[in-house]
Amino acid sequence: MVKHSDPNSKLIAENRRARFDYFIEEEIEAGIILMGSEVKSLRQGGSNIGESYASVENGELWLINGYIAPYLQAKTWGHEERRKRKLLVSRRELARLWNATAREGMTIVPIRMYFNDRGIVKLKIGIAKGKKLSDKRATEAKRDWGREKQRLLKQHS
């Protein structure tokens, strides 16, 4: 059995809107192929995965539109901020992702990017289905009610 690392070990970036905009059906941990300057930039905290998504192309999984800030000390041999980056998953997981995206309305969204306990960059991706406006309103109402409940409990204790 594969030991999955703790995703809270060193959080780099989190897509906070993913759970608001999508129903996340399943989460998968993926490795990511990076250049040295990208890893150094991530250690400084320069990343954004809010507008990115993943797709299966030619039997490979790619992260598209993920932003990693330029590393200032690597001016000559730096990296492109929004280039396609290859994600590493097992063949079985890749087949599951491909089958999921073949269904209508399903997509692959990045949820969080972090360093695992060995210092390797990992990306938690989710198989997701987009929410309609009414679903988003229900989620927001549920969240507001939870906050109101906590406020009332805090006042009475």
Swiss-Prot record:
GO CC, any one term: cytosol
Keyword Cytoplasm on entry: yes
Pfam families: SmpB (PF01668)
Classification via InterPro entries: SmpB, SsrA-bd_prot, SsrA-bd_prot_CS
Keyword Glycoprotein: no
GO terms classed as biological process: trans-translation
Matches recorded under CDD domains: SmpB (cd09294)
Positions of the UniProt region annotated as Disordered: 138-157
GO molecular function terms noted in the UniProt entry: RNA binding
Record HAMAP family: SmpB
Protein name per its UniProtKB record: SsrA-binding protein
Source organism (scientific name): Cereibacter sphaeroides (strain ATCC 17025 / ATH 2.4.3)
Lineage, uppermost ranks: Bacteria, Pseudomonadati, Pseudomonadota, Alphaproteobacteria, Rhodobacterales
